[in-house]
């Protein structure tokens, strides 16, 4: 399962992301496995993802933000995560927030939760989304003492799924993430079917975000691209 760490090694987990659904796509399996073991998991969303639509007339920010909060609550129930915090920043604006403000909010969470492990984005934000990349900056600056694990893509998986990921349209830049060799990953999970099924059920609890993906990918492709969760130690 893992060349280094196992989920049991992670202790109390603070999982910090930009938008509701980031955590489920990138760490839903880790979080649900930890909860199954009785570990404390606190999930944090910096924004409500209220601008995450190509149709703002049908989905104005107030409406979409409320829907995404409700969807996120449903997804957290599926994963067994009972503690979910919202930082209340506006979606799409994190890069313009004074860095000291963002770092201070993360520091408050670290002081409150006292996690053994923090999960978040790597510097590339996985998709080069500016909000994702900003969260990495805040968390890395604030994080001291706890183990910091940043979401990555295993090199072999990236090579096999490159065309699918391009078709999915997840990248927000001409840049692409570099695959990480398995032996360099701190935590590498290939989710077994029960865990993957739970993760997919959590994703399906967020139809405002997942239905566009399922319009592009086949069910088998969507299942495959969500089976692995990988992290590097920073």
What are these regions (language model features)?
Residues 1-14, 92, 96-234:
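Metal-dependent de-N-acetylase/amidase catalytic core
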Residues 1-114, 141, 232:
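Active-site rim/loop-helix segments in enzyme catalytic domains that contact anionic ligands
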């Amino acid at each position: 399962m893992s060349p280094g760490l196992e989920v049991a090694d992670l202790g109390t987990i603070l999982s910090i992301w930009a938008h509701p659904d980031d955590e489920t796509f990138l760490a839903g399996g880790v979080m649900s496995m930890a909860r199954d073991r009785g570990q404390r998991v606190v999930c944090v969303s910096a924004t409500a993802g209220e601008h995450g639509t190509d149709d703002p007339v049908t989905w104005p920010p107030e409406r979409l933000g409320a829907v995404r909060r409700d969807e996120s609550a449903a997804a957290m129930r599926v994963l067994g995560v009972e503690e979910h915090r919202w930082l209340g920043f506006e979606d799409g604006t994190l890069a313009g927030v004074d860095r000291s403000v963002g770092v201070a909010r993360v520091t408050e969470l670290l002081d409150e939760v006292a996690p053994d492990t923090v999960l978040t984005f790597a510097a590339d934000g996985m998709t080069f989304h500016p909000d994702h990349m900003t969260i990495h900056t805040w968390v890395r600056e604030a994080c001291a003492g706890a183990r910091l694990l940043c979401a990555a893509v295993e090199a072999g998986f990236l090579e096999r799924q490159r065309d699918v990921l391009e078709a999915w349209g997840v990248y927000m830049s001409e840049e692409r993430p570099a695959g990480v060799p398995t032996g360099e990953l701190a935590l590498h999970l290939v989710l077994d079917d029960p865990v993957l099924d739970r993760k997919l059920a959590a994703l399906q609890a967020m139809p405002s975000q997942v239905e566009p993906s399922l319009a592009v990918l086949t069910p088998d492709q969507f299942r495959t691209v969500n089976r692995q969760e990988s992290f590097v130690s920073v």
